[in-house]
Amino acid sequence: MNKMIKYVMSLLMVMTLCLPTMQAQVVNDEEVVEDNEDSAVADSAMVETIAADTLRLPWTETVKVGLDKLLKSKMFETSQVGIMVWDLEADSCIYRFRERQLMRPASTMKLVTAITALDKLGGSYQFKTTLKYTGTIDNGVLNGDVYCIGGMDPRFNNDDMTAFVTSLKDMGVDSIHGSIYADRSMKDEDLLGEGWCWDDNNPVLSPLVFGRKDIFMERFLAKLKDAGIFYAGSGTSVKRCPASAFTICTRFHTMDQILHKMMKDSDNLYAESMYYQIASSTGNRPASAKSARNVQRQLVRKIGLDPARYKFADGSGLSLYNYVSAELEVKLLRYAYQDENILPHLKQSLPIAGVDGTLKRRMRSGFAHGNVKAKTGTVTGVIGLAGYCKAANGHDLCFSILNNGIMHSNNARSFADKVCELLCQP
């Protein structure tokens, strides 16, 4: 019993001696924390700085992460999108997502048409409409026939028509004793493109267009009357001009003039006119959409893709039958970039973000503003954007974004704009 008491007393003495030390240690720990609060915050900031400086993702990885995040939008639960981004300086793919998925391109189809035309026809190509005659001119009387030869120039305007009539007057013609013909042999008789909707505002597919309407001959007769040139006939007919006919006047418009309107304003008439110039270049008369498609397929094969994988129907993108991919558009943009005979003409025709054309009201601020040069595409259920931009590292990029099955076009446009901002930001 005495031993037990002594043992307990000894234990209590030890605990009493140790308690101040234990309490001091706890206080010291609390003081350390309190005294070093500022240091702790500084250390935390230092870690973040180090992470930003040394652990920062390369630019290409930042783009990938950012695009992956954008693709998590609920919009893509009910719609489809294909994206491809290509670094033209490094000549390598930066990003791809369902880039081979077939999509309706809407007006980004005009990119395919423009690049094909520049490749086939060249930047110096001219759209022309010619006035010719047969017979003789005696004492102010043209004893013969007059031919208006259509070249499907969508830009032919009042000044051009005036030049036609003035040229006749300059030759001393006061009256025409013969017939006046419209030579429409340049293209086939199809008035609508394959797969066009009947209720769309479709362009007039005529080799002789005036004021966007099929009223060329009507206006020509009116101009003759205004100029005091008497015409003995009662109307006009359609007939191919003989090779022996003499030229009175030819009016030209340049490739760049047509491209500018076609791309900046997404003009369907201009695009279809371009399409039939491509067809006409094959030598097949009358020119047809089929001939133009064959030229497109040749170019697709030239850039290393299989044309059998795509469907081409028209030059404007109005057709519901067009099916392309983001990969195809990017490969064509890459091809154009590498050809000094194509790129200057193409690039100056593209809408500039926040500046002009169909991109004037988009990307009006931020890094994409004034940087992105791209063709828009919009039809019911489809939004597209494809073109060029410059990354913060100075590299030129080309990209294609094709979005199908959409209910709210503004959401799809916003998505495409965010993609462009991501590509352009540092």
Q: What are the functions of these language-model segments?
A:
Residues M1-E30, S44, T54:
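Bacterial Sec-dependent N-terminal signal peptides
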Residues D91, P105-G123, I180, R219-L224, ...:
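Active-site SXXK
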Residues K311-D314, L318-P426:
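C-terminal soluble interaction/assembly domains
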Residues K213-S349:
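A small/polar active-site loop signature that marks catalytic segments
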Residues V27-E89, C93-Q101, T166-M171:
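Beta-lactamase-like hydrolase cores
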Residues T49-P58, R96-P105, V146-F156, V165, ...:
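Second-shell loop/turn segments in exported
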